[in-house]
């Protein structure tokens, strides 16, 4: 207890200590604002986005729309990680978001390359004729 009091006294004696204390206040206010939005709202939004993406993958037969729906699903999962990470004030959610964002970019690049190849071969983007592709 004495150590904590001496550290607090030393911090108070540091020049510009009031400016450092002024920088801490906006961070605390930002964390309070995050507490105003319930976690359930963010997770419900992520679930709705995931369901929309899943319906798009299952219903649409166009390869481009299926790729876009898959991106929506990945963004919904990333949103769920960010919401959960902000709820528990843990940076792991944001780290997973960056990982998912990188994975989505790689998936989009490979998917678009396959899409272009498929379109040049077939002249359309209907996925039902994909089983006729040859090596």
UniProtKB/Swiss-Prot annotation:
Keyword Translocase in record: yes
Reaction it catalyzes: a quinone + NADH + 5 H(+)(in) = a quinol + NAD(+) + 4 H(+)(out)
Membrane topology, as annotated: Multi-pass membrane protein
UniProt keywords, alphabetically: Cell inner membrane, Cell membrane, Membrane, NAD, Quinone, Translocase, Transmembrane, Transmembrane helix, Transport, Ubiquinone
Regions that span the bilayer: 33-53, 63-83, 95-115
Coiled-coil segments: none
Record flagged with keyword Cell inner membrane: yes
A GO-annotated cellular component: NADH dehydrogenase complex
Top class in the EC scheme: translocase
Single GO BP term: ATP synthesis coupled electron transport
Subcellular location per the Swiss-Prot or TrEMBL entry: Cell inner membrane
Listed EC numbers: 7.1.1.-
InterPro entries linked to this entry: NADH_UbQ_OxRdtase_chain4L/K, NUOK/Mnh_C1-like
GO molecular function per UniProt: NADH:ubiquinone reductase (non-electrogenic) activity; quinone binding
Function description: NDH-1 shuttles electrons from NADH, via FMN and iron-sulfur (Fe-S) centers, to quinones in the respiratory chain. The immediate electron acceptor for the enzyme in this species is believed to be ubiquinone. Couples the redox reaction to proton translocation (for every two electrons transferred, four hydrogen ions are translocated across the cytoplasmic membrane), and thus conserves the redox energy in a proton gradient.
Family of this protein: Belongs to the complex I subunit 4L family.
Subunit structure: NDH-1 is composed of 14 different subunits. Subunits NuoA, H, J, K, L, M, N constitute the membrane sector of the complex.
The protein's name: NADH-quinone oxidoreductase subunit K
